[in-house]
């Protein structure tokens, strides 16, 4: 998938080619997750022989390794396997969203929209716009992670770039930019919910608030956008080379780049319907007692139907313009056409569903056995006697490594906050800055962590454009983003620390 010239190129390219070669020797992702489950079970059996334990930093309860290869372990497997699969966090969301996105895709709405964007937008703004949307998309949860990569892939083809470059750039922007945004959003509320009680472990006088990282996360957008753009234009696009459309999956359809009068008419009204839908959503959310707000607090972010129902919102937001375009362009002439599109959209997720079955078991094994918690606590304790820049680097590295074991941001910070926050308060750091350090460390390995539930989805997307695509090749195009984010963002945190600038309103670096 790399050009011959690039294969013989720089040290960086040779390194990435080696990563790709090694990664491609890995089994199919579903088999890989199964083997990881087996390996994890064996590991818990071995560790349990040594009676390894830790004290939970929040409850102070002693936590032991639970052996999966035991009576209780086998009982858990029998009782919970199907539940683990059906309750997998991303499964229902992805399948529901794909109903709406599938109609918009199958009718040709997305394709014609991309052609229209390419024809009208200045070429130099297309890539920065995709990156910015990806970074800011975390405000609406995981929406950008699902929607943006396939849109970017189609757009990259239209402007003459390799679609995999678009997929990986959009994905890296969406998941790697979780700790960057110009507004306070769901991620801020999520981490704050753990930081506040962790602060109270050692102090009742330190004030915290949900927006206490705002200055830093807003400034991070300015730092991340050019970083991701540079990696894409200087490394990923040249490395992937010219796209060979013969590699495209047989059932992937490409339409003409020409827009007919009928299609232009349908596209105009589809776009209008999209805008009207968004406006109606905003108007509905404005009233103080809107059903989209938290009934008790009135918040639109904290446990609000607006955020909890984001999957349904995405479905509707894309289904409506897809239907309008399909009806006006005559792509949908009966309910049978619509039903067929629904089925094809969900059917295209078959590979993802199989991978999810095994990935769900791996996550459940880590949680049930307590291995994830013990690894996090043991690692955090290594940092207790450090300070300053060394401590910042240590927490970023540990958070990044824990992210490779535990995918859920709330699960990780729920474990680490009761350790990091009190520990750094004692050293002299305000909880707001501790939270920033964690969020950066958590974000930088998001593009490459196998625990991210959307990585299998990205692989499914990629295989539509390259039938030979394997996980190793995909990771080799994602790794440069993680490396670049690690270097640039860590340096940015350290510079911010040395300057002593507050990370947000009510969020100083040091405890006064």
Give the predicted meaning of each segment.
Residues 72-73, 85-91, 118-129, 163-165, ...:
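Membrane-interfacial loop-to-helix junctions in multi-pass transporters
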Residues 94-95, 122-153, 158, 353-362, ...:
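Hydrophobic alpha-helical transmembrane segments of multi-pass integral membrane proteins
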Residues 26-34, 38, 63-111, 303-371:
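Core transmembrane alpha-helical segments of multi-pass membrane transporters/permeases
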Residues 14, 53-87, 201-209, 286-306, ...:
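Interfacial loop/helix-cap signal at membrane boundaries in integral membrane proteins
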Residues 32-48, 94-102, 133-135, 173-177, ...:
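Hydrophobic core segments of alpha-helical transmembrane domains in multi-pass membrane transport
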Residues 46-72, 187-190, 289-298, 369-374, ...:
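Interfacial/capping segments of alpha-helical transmembrane domains
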Residues 1-25, 54-69, 237-266, 509-512:
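Intrinsically disordered, low-complexity non-transmembrane regions of multi-pass membrane transporters
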Residues 20, 149, 153-244, 260, ...:
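Membrane-core helix-loop-helix motifs of multi-pass transport proteins
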């Amino acid at each position: 998938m790399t050009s011959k010239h690039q294969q013989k190129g720089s040290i960086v390219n040779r390194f990435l080619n080696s990563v790709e070669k090694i990664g491609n020797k890995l089994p199919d992702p579903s088999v890989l997750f199964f083997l990881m489950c087996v390996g994890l079970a064996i590991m818990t059996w071995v560790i349990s022989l040594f009676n390894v334990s830790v004290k939970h930093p929040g409850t102070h309860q002693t936590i032991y390794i639970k052996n999966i290869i035991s009576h209780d372990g086998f009982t858990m497997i029998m009782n919970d396997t199907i539940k683990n699969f059906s309750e997998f966090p991303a499964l229902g969301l992805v399948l529901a969203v794909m109903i709406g996105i599938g109609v918009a895709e199958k009718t040709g709405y997305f394709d014609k929209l991309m052609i229209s964007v390419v024809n009208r937008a200045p070429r130099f703004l297309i890539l920065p716009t995709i990156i910015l949307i990806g970074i800011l998309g975390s405000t609406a949860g995981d929406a950008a992670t699902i929607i943006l990569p396939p849109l970017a892939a189609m757009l990259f083809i239209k402007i003459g770039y390799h679609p995999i470059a678009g997929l990986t750039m959009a994905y890296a922007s969406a998941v790697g930019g979780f700790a960057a945004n110009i507004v306070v959003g769901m991620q801020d509320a999520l981490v704050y919910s753990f930081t506040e009680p962790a602060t109270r472990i050692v102090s009742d006088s330190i004030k915290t608030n949900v927006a206490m990282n705002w200055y830093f996360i807003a400034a991070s957008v300015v730092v991340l956008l050019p970083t991701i753009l540079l990696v894409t234009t200087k490394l990923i696009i040249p490395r992937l080379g010219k796209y060979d459309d013969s590699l495209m999956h047989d059932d992937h359809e490409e339409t003409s780049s020409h827009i007919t009068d009928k299609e232009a008419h349908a596209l105009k009204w589809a776009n209008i319907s999209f805008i009207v839908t968004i406006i109606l959503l905003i108007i509905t959310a404005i009233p103080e007692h809107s059903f989209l707000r938290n009934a008790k607090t009135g918040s639109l972010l904290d446990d609000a139907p607006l955020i909890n129902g984001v999957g349904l919102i995405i479905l509707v937001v894309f289904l409506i313009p897809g239907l309008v375009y399909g009806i006006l362009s005559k792509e949908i002439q009966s309910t049978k056409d619509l039903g067929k599109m629904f089925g094809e959209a969900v059917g295209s997720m078959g590979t993802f569903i199989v991978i999810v079955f095994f990935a769900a078991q791996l996550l459940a094994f880590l949680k049930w056995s307590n291995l994830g918690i013990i690894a996090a606590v043991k690692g955090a304790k290594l940092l207790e006697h450090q300070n300053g820049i060394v401590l910042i680097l240590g927490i970023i590295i540990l958070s990044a490594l824990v992210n490779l074991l535990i995918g859920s941001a709330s699960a990780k910070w729920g474990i680490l906050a009761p350790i990091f926050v009190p520990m750094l308060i004692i050293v002299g750091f305000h909880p707001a800055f501790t939270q920033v350090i964690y969020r950066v460390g958590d974000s930088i390995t998001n593009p490459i962590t196998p625990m991210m539930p959307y990585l299998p989805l990205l692989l499914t997307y990629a295989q539509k454009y390259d039938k030979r695509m394997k996980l190793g090749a995909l990771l080799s195009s994602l790794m440069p983003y993680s490396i670049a984010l690690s270097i640039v963002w860590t340096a940015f945190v350290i510079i911010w620390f040395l300057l002593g600038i507050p990370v947000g309103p009510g969020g100083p670096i040091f405890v006064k």
